[in-house]
Amino acid sequence: MQKVTIQEAEHLLQEIMSEEDDRFQILIKDERKGVQKLILKWYKQKELAQKEKEKFLEMSKYENALREKGLTYIAGIDEVGRGPLAGPVVTAAVILPEDFYIPGLNDSKKLSEAKRERFYGEIKAKAIAIGVGIVSPQVIDEINIYQATKQAMLDAIANLSCTPEYLLIDAMKLPTPIPQTSIIKGDAKSISISAASIIAKVTRDRMMKELGEKYPAYGFEQHMGYGTKQHLEAIEAHGVLEEHRKSFAPIKDMIQK
């Protein structure tokens, strides 16, 4: 291989998968600083990819153990929106195929919005089934947020296109005959729960952005209904909306004034 430009070396390294590649052996002997920087970057990317693969395998242990018992339809379930002062609580149930692989998958709260959106599209395209459950602020006020979250999770299961054989749930127990395991911080320990957290988060964020367009003075598209200074000041200035949870402090106190 004749001497290549720095740009050509960069393109080659994008194609090269292994140190054993003859082209890599030539590039690694190239003493130009630009090429050596690219080699270092290549090693760092490989190290990151390996760490992501190991993390993904670790997060697949619950699903793999159940598959070894002959189960196929394993649903991960998670919620988003228990804490906000406005908007619904949203849950998702996701059944993934055995060959599912998205490196970098993690708890939705630890991902950037751009990454969540990308993963959302990939999960939607690859999942065996996805069900979403949405419970309104009015119902939250009637039955409390804990019961509303359980109801939303049961709705998400009911909205799946196939019946799950097993449930992996983030920190909840559900009143259903389907066998289940509750996992504390499950969105960082199970790929199915992590996928569900991403579906639920993106679904709810999109709903809150629509609310932001409907009520521009409240800034819902920025705080997603959480009790930020901006949100509380907007409530003081413009009043409580039907989308607010009237059983939540400080909304409850504002109404009683």
Swiss-Prot record:
Residues 72-257 form the RNase H type-2 domain. It catalyses: Endonucleolytic cleavage to 5'-phosphomonoester. A divalent metal cation binds at D78, E79, D170. Transmembrane segments: none annotated. It is an enzyme of class 3 (hydrolase). CDD domains: RNase_HII_bacteria_HII_like. Its main location: cytoplasm. Its cofactor is Mn(2+); Mg(2+). GO terms for biological process: DNA replication, removal of RNA primer; mismatch repair. It is found in: Cytoplasm. It comes from the Bacteria. InterPro entries: RNase_HII (IPR022898), RNase_HII/HIII (IPR001352), RNase_HII/HIII_dom (IPR024567), RNaseH-like_sf (IPR012337), RNaseH_sf (IPR036397). Manganese or magnesium. Binds 1 divalent metal ion per monomer in the absence of substrate. May bind a second metal ion after substrate binding. One of its GO terms (cellular component) is ribonuclease H2 complex. NCBIfam families: PRK00015.1-1, PRK00015.1-3. Belongs to the RNase HII family. PANTHER family: RIBONUCLEASE H2 SUBUNIT A, RIBONUCLEASE HII. This is Ribonuclease HII.
